[in-house]
Amino acid sequence: MLNLRIMAPNRIVWNSDIQEIILSTNSGQIGILPNHASVLTALDIGIVKIRLNDQWSTMALMGGFAMIDNNNLTILVNDAEKASEIDYQEAQETFQKAKTNLEEAEGNKKKEIEALLVFKRAKARLEAINMASKL
């Protein structure tokens, strides 16, 4: 088992032993099982899948860092939302609005970067819900 702690600035999001986790890093996805080599990696905005008691849970992570050492995985994130706590209708509306804003920001670098960040967050939330419904 892996001891997983996911911490946001204002709360502990997850603190328990798990069987497996799949994270979105800046260079792609990484799967972590017990006895994994020590790793420190940056996390991209995206989804995380956690397996506990042969059941998968899905969460949207808003970027951060992960450190694994000696079967202890600590994840520090800007924010996180469990798929079960995300309202589908609100997430869908936020995604569509973010997509429109990203298209409208084209040509203005500063607005484009800000809009891309909002779009990636909205997309991660929607993907977390969609993936959770398939598990």
From Swiss-Prot:
Protein's cellular compartments: Plastid, Chloroplast thylakoid membrane
A Pfam family hit: ATP-synt_DE_N
Top-level taxon in the UniProt lineage: Eukaryota
Alphabetical keyword list: ATP synthesis, CF(1), Chloroplast, Hydrogen ion transport, Ion transport, Membrane, Plastid, Thylakoid, Transport
Membrane topology per record: Peripheral membrane protein
Keyword Transferase on entry: no
Annotated GO MF terms: ATP binding; proton-transporting ATP synthase activity, rotational mechanism
InterPro entries: ATP_synth_F1_dsu/esu (IPR001469), ATP_synth_F1_dsu/esu_N (IPR020546), ATP_synth_F1_esu_C (IPR020547), ATPsynth_dsu/esu_N (IPR036771)
Gene Ontology CC: one annotated term: proton-transporting ATP synthase complex
Family: Belongs to the ATPase epsilon chain family.
Record's subunit section: F-type ATPases have 2 components, CF(1) - the catalytic core - and CF(0) - the membrane proton channel. CF(1) has five subunits: alpha(3), beta(3), gamma(1), delta(1), epsilon(1). CF(0) has three main subunits: a, b and c.
Function summary: Produces ATP from ADP in the presence of a proton gradient across the membrane.
HAMAP family for the chain: ATP_synth_epsil_bac (MF_00530)
Name of the molecule in the record: ATP synthase epsilon chain, chloroplastic
Annotated organism of origin: Marchantia polymorpha (Common liverwort)
